[in-house]
């Protein structure tokens, strides 16, 4: 590991952010710290993760939502001090890493199936 990678790992450890596991297709709520004049407040941004880029300290993700009938996308830096928290609301079942095709879709065709938790199969021998 070279010097830059070591410094990035130390910075990530110093930030000690609680980042949940999420992937493209998941619906997340990102609470963003917004400064308006002298006031500071948290603003919730809820949408579907359409992309995630894992690059250590430079990791980011794109969240897409429909606001007043218009598609709005916002890119967040994963380790940004502006992000107060990230909450996974719903897991999505998709087969792609980048869901850019959702940009051309609207309505029912833009829906994403929910990933249900795996059911454990109990054999008859173990049940007896």
Swiss-Prot record:
Record-linked Gene3D superfamilies: 2.30.30.790
Single GO BP term: translation
Protein origin, superkingdom: Bacteria
Keyword Ribonucleoprotein: yes
One GO CC term on file: cytosolic large ribosomal subunit
Keywords, sorted A to Z: Ribonucleoprotein, Ribosomal protein
InterPro entries linked to this entry: Ribosomal_bL19 (IPR001857), Ribosomal_bL19_CS (IPR018257), Ribosomal_bL19_sf (IPR038657), Translation_prot_SH3-like_sf (IPR008991)
UniProt GO MF annotations: structural constituent of ribosome
Keyword Ribonucleoprotein: yes
SUPFAM superfamilies on file: Translation proteins SH3-like domain
Pfam families, per database record: Ribosomal_L19
Regions crossing the membrane: none
Record family assignment: Belongs to the bacterial ribosomal protein bL19 family.
Xref: HAMAP family: Ribosomal_bL19
Known function: This protein is located at the 30S-50S ribosomal subunit interface and may play a role in the structure and function of the aminoacyl-tRNA binding site.
The protein's name in its UniProt record: Large ribosomal subunit protein bL19
The encoding gene: rplS
């Amino acid at each position: 590991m070279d010097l830059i990678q070591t410094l990035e790992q130390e910075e990530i450890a110093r930030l000690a952010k609680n980042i949940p596991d999420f992937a493209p297709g998941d619906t997340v709520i990102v609470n963003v710290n917004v400064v308006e004049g002298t006031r500071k407040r948290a603003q919730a941004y809820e949408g579907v993760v359409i992309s995630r880029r894992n690059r250590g300290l430079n990791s980011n993700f794109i969240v897409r939502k429909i606001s007043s009938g218009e598609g709005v996308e916002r890119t967040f830096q994963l380790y940004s001090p502006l992000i107060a928290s990230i909450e996974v609301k719903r897991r999505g079942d998709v087969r792609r890493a980048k869901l850019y095709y959702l940009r051309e879709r609207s309505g029912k065709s833009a829906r994403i199936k929910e990933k249900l938790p795996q059911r454990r199969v109990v054999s008859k021998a173990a049940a007896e």
